[in-house]
């Protein structure tokens, strides 16, 4: 099994992800090769909480251009993790 810190890359802080905090849902960018079971175990191990549900999605990178040179931001995988009632992740508190 992979190290949990390799599975969870970073939290996502956007207007939409902040509104999901009211429903006890937290959003992370995760390793694209990780499956839902690995993501669940990583969140439970790192933050010491119980996970009810994990939704994942692959996000395509955007087309960018610097002067006349076209490029693309990398694709990534995003996970929305729903925690058990009463559990919280302190990292997201105060947002």
UniProtKB/Swiss-Prot annotation:
Part of the 50S ribosomal subunit. Contacts protein L29, and trigger factor when it is bound to the ribosome. The gene is rplW. One of the early assembly proteins it binds 23S rRNA. One of the proteins that surrounds the polypeptide exit tunnel on the outside of the ribosome. Forms the main docking site for trigger factor binding to the ribosome. It comes from Pelotomaculum thermopropionicum (strain DSM 13744 / JCM 10971 / SI). PANTHER family: 60S RIBOSOMAL PROTEIN L23A. Keywords: Ribonucleoprotein, Ribosomal protein, RNA-binding, rRNA-binding. It holds the Pfam family Ribosomal_L23. GO terms for biological process: translation. Belongs to the universal ribosomal protein uL23 family. One of its GO terms (cellular component) is ribonucleoprotein complex. One of its GO terms (molecular function) is structural constituent of ribosome. InterPro entries: Nucleotide-bd_a/b_plait_sf, Ribosomal_uL23-like, Ribosomal_uL23/eL15/eS24_sf. This is Large ribosomal subunit protein uL23.
